[in-house]
Amino acid sequence: MSLSVTRENFDEWMVPVYVPAPFIPVRGEGSRLWDQQGKEYIDFAGGIAVNALGHAHPALREALNEQANRFWHIGNGYTNEPALRLAKKLIDATFAERVFFCNSGAEANEAALKLARKYAHDRVGNHKSGIVAFKNAFHGRTLFTVSAGGQPTYSQDFAPLPPDIRHAAYNDLNSASALIDDNTCAVIVEPVQGEGGVIPATKAFLQGLRELCDRHQALLIFDEVQTGVGRTGELYAYMHYGVTPDILTTAKALGGGFPIGAMLTTQDYASVMTPGTHGTTYGGNPLATAVAGKVLDIINTPEMQNGVRQRHDAFIERLNTLNVRFGMFSEIRGLGLLLGCVLQTEFAGKAKLIAQEAAKAGVMVLIAGGDVVRFAPALNVSDEEIATGLDRFALACERLQTGGVPCG
């Protein structure tokens, strides 16, 4: 008999690095979830841009069950068929020639930064160790990646931090140019800053970074952990910009909810990562790669990408209509189905409160800082679910605006 658990048990048993919602989801199907009490929610959070095909997608369940009936794990002393097939699919779909599998976006970014340092060390010398990242970025929670992320809140209590990491202003080429020099081994950037407020990069900014990296022989790393695998209306966001990185990191939606990450790069850069220079116990395991292979099969199609663009338009139209009614947002921005609503000054700092009220109304949304409500729904969310979910979101906005929820 299963142990009966409640939300209060989290506070009793778990390390308190999260503050979960007061309800516990127990079942999902597509873009809908149900909690322990049977209440239904429309899911516009998507596990923070992870559940690209919604919950319990039948094709993903089939792929997982099929592999689970064969074998689960074998270790990196061997390879396996699902991993090799997934690597080939990623290579065929992108600029990449080599793939490294891991378990998360943080691990993928850790591998990318280590590769950049190793490449510079081997080809130039120890002095070429500088990394340029951007303020308000987010690249993971390892000590290296949290240092690269330009949010001191996440790193300030863990000093001393890895050295030679500097932060420029995002979308400011002059700021980046002042920091990138011949001692820079890598520049790491998100094509859309997700945690930093859902801020798309400008084309000129990314093109300028590419030119600066070429000039100073630095590697350009695109962190596509949140933007990748169809989220923006292209398989990867770099395809929007006509700018090809040297290294790309991907995770989140790649597994559709099953943990997996990957670093993609070229043969030349990968060649410095000789046996023993890096590794992972579970990376590239057959369960994860079998599921991810099916995710790519479904998402990497013109129909799916066109659908993302159409759903983007539907969200924007309805959010604009909602904003005419309530006037709560100063800007609605993003790419594809990664969207952010920036709160007006009157409601500054209330993004979390809106998300909490939205959940009470039966729709799950995210935040990106205190002033931005973030949406990252499944890429196959239906028109009916968009309409129903945003109607429920409107109830939360109405409560906040009319004083049903304290704003001060």
UniProtKB/Swiss-Prot annotation:
Leading EC class: transferase
Keyword Transferase: yes
Catalytic activity: N(2)-succinyl-L-ornithine + 2-oxoglutarate = N-succinyl-L-glutamate 5-semialdehyde + L-glutamate
CDD domains: OAT_like
Keyword annotations from UniProtKB, A to Z: Aminotransferase, Arginine metabolism, Pyridoxal phosphate, Transferase
Induction: By nitrogen and carbon starvation, and arginine, via the ArgR and Crp transcriptional regulators.
UniProt protein name: Succinylornithine transaminase
Chain's gene name: astC
